[in-house]
Amino acid sequence: MSKLVIVESPHKATMIKKYLGKSYDVTASVGHIRDLPAAKLSVDIKNDFAPKYAIVKGKEKLVKELKEKAANADEVLLATDPDREGEAISWHLATVLGLPLDEKNRVKFNEINENAVKKGIASPEKIDMDLVDAQQARRILDRLVGYKLSPFVSQKIHRGLSAGRVQSVAVRLVVDREEEIRKFVPEEYWSLDAKFTAPSSKKAFKAAFTGDETGKIKLKTKEETDAILARLQDAEYSVSSVKKGTRRRSPAPPFTTSTMQQDASRKLGFQAKRTMKIAQELYEGMEVEGFGATGLITYMRTDSLRISEEARQEGNAFIEANYGKQYLHEKPRYFKTKASAQDGHEAIRPTVPAITPEIAKKSLTPEQFKLYSLIWKRFMASLMSNCIQDTVKIEIKAVGERDKNTDRYCTFNASGYTVRFDGYTRLYEAATDEDEDEGKLPEIKAGDALKLKEMLGNQHFTQPPARYTEGSLIKMLEETGVGRPSTYASIVSTITSREYVVREQKQLKPTELGEAVVKLLKEHFPNIVNVKFTASMESDLDKVEHHEIDYIAMLHTFYDGFDKTLEKAKADMEGVKIKLKEDETNIPCEKCGRMMVIKTGRFGKFLACPGYPECKNTKPYVIETTATCPVCGGKVIQKKSKKGYTFFGCENYPECNFMTWDKPTDEKCPKCGKSLFKKKGGILACLDENCGFEKKAERKKKSTKTQEED
């Protein structure tokens, strides 16, 4: 009896084939075989939004082969990924191959190993049409918004632009943050920090001014700070109280898609799309010495914190065997999954805890190793005992010369801790954790006299909210309910590739084009860029999945309002064209002599002649650097890739093909005199192949205004 098993990717097919016998033919659909054709709307609005699917261009031969294999097989099993998208792919395959939808031909497994695959194959289910409907509803919604709204935005701002149901909200978040930064007015404040030594130790410790006998004091000006310093002239310092305690720090839960993307961004510098690509490779698996062919992690698109009891027991056994029983948490932790989570899968975890990162390293690329290490350590730490710290808080009383023989005094506080038991931190520390070597205080008791070593008054200014990074934007999308685990990476990738947002030193900054699109949508399509409205649509899609609402009724409700808004916007904006700012340059047009201007188009900035339409001359806009090309000596210019990444190349391209991701600097190589470029890890390097000079970049010291008390 022959059986045909269809999965999405060829690599996944190769892995699964190793677990099944010769009677199984495992093949790949290579993603979707049907989709909505891009050339037209492909949705019959008048017929309850019936989608008009077509075979994906270029897959006709593959579909023919799948049909032939299905016709010759005694049984066809659909083993695509276990989520909405995977369910929809299975449904499309069943429809095209003529498989009955009431038969049990859908196979699911959350991890790829022999046990999970054979268990899934042995217990097929029917295709879940609620999951399929939820995916179709999302696809149709996105097509309606994109197909109807994009032409309007293009007509009013610039040809070739696009607007999307979720991407527009993401751009709005970035734009709103930029507006907050622009409107921010910094406020001055001061801190007063002292260094003391105690009788028991020669090593100085830090303490911060907190107030006086009247209570807490916030220092806002230099004058206020100087007044306190005057009070502290010839002061005597003593310990007024010592409070000791114990702090227990718990580990973070295992990863969800969002937290994995955030941590990979923060710790590894990976962009979300790259993280998901590597995670997919780890999920699909490889040969690991001593363990055979196996997937290394569970399914990576999840918002659940749940882990199976089997995985918990395997992890606990590994911890006890390798670290000792004291590193096991006294009772199982059950992390609470948020109410809006789909919870269709476990959290992201290693499939086999015994496959440590070091064991897997030989089978992995450097990037795979880094991400697997992060996932493995995070999961194992979540099972481990708490970190126990002994804390101490010291209050210091300062009585200056003028305050003696009165009830007046100033107060300083110092706090610190020592680690009594490292617990889970032996394996994993969150990216934001403080350094354990800091904050340790000497043995000290109430009444001890302290010796002042130095006193510094430091000027500060309140800081505006930080721009989003890719990780913090994903966190905000998750917190506000916009998007789902399967969409976070594509959202960020889309808004950067379309030049609505650019990356500047890992921060996301809106372009003039992005701001113009958001302004237009805010004025005429407030719901489309409304965070709460978009989140409610995501919630409705979840309800479709759980058979709580009908997806066709949901589409009618959305489209009726959207269509009226679109028609009103067209009427209100008839004849109106939004003109983006054009900066004049000192570059003459070689055709007519006018000074060219910088314009913003679909693919970013370019130079254009202001004499349009009489003169239609355009040319690429390049940003020159001070560096010279190490190959031919030409100028090094800044460029943008098709995906929105910044790189640097020679002005003489294509005659000279020099290109680098490393940022050029003003420094020259002491060996050959050519420009130095800044590589990862703070290394300055000469890129001349015949030179190879490298040195560590010097850190710029931060300057602060201080006042010192002798």
Give short role names for the model-derived ranges.
Residues 2-3, 24, 150, 183, ...:
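Basic, low-complexity terminal or inter-domain segments flanking catalytic cores
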Residues 138-149, 166, 196, 247-259, ...:
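Core structural elements
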Residues 215-253, 448:
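Metal- or metallocofactor-binding catalytic centers and their adjacent structured scaffolds
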Residues 1-139, 148, 211, 222, ...:
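Intrinsically disordered, low-complexity regulatory segments
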Residues 14-38, 168-218, 382-437:
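Structured, non-catalytic alpha/beta "coupling" segments that mediate domain-domain communication
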Residues 1, 81-82, 158-162, 244-253, ...:
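Conserved short loop/turn motifs at secondary-structure junctions
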